């Protein structure tokens, strides 16, 4: 299955605690918790472009599976990491955050991020 497509956030778990743990200010946490972000994924072999739009904030990351890339984190910082593919999962570690994005079925993406013992999960559906 291909990741390519546009997905809208449907649900999320542990949003506030995770955002606090990564250092986002309360004002941004409150502002962002009710916004349904849109993720657009373009996949061409091992090359990916991921655009995440949350309100007026847009994060664009491009990477090639297995090669080091500079990626923008949720806090807006840039960090180098290597994205690995494991079947229908993309995995990366950035600044201590472990991220796994799984194509659950043809229409659903689950993204789980973990920092220490604090986890965050978001489910997005294809639109």
From Swiss-Prot:
Cellular component (GO) terms are: cytoplasm
Alphabetized GO MF terms: lipid binding
**CDD domains assigned:** FABP1
Keyword Disulfide bond on entry: no
Keywords per UniProt: Cytoplasm, Lipid-binding, Transport
Q: Where in the cell is it found?
A: Cytoplasm
Q: Does the keyword Thylakoid apply?
A: no
Give the family this protein belongs to, as stated in its UniProt record: Belongs to the calycin superfamily. Fatty-acid binding protein (FABP) family.
What is the name of the protein in this document?
A: Fatty acid-binding protein, liver-type
**Native species of this protein?**
Epinephelus coioides
């Amino acid at each position: 299955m291909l990741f390519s497509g546009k997905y809208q956030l449907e649900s999320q778990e542990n949003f506030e605690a995770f955002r606090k743990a990564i250092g986002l200010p309360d004002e941004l946490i409150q502002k962002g918790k009710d916004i349904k972000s849109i993720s657009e994924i373009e996949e061409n072999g091992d090359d990916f472009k991921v655009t995440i739009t949350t309100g007026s904030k847009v994060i664009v990351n491009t990477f090639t599976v297995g090669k080091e890339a500079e990626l923008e984190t949720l806090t807006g910082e840039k960090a180098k990491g290597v994205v690995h593919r494991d079947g229908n999962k993309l995995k990366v570690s950035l600044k201590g955050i472990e991220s796994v994005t799984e194509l659950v079925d043809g229409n659903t993406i689950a993204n789980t991020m973990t920092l220490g013992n604090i986890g965050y999960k978001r489910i997005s559906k294809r639109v």
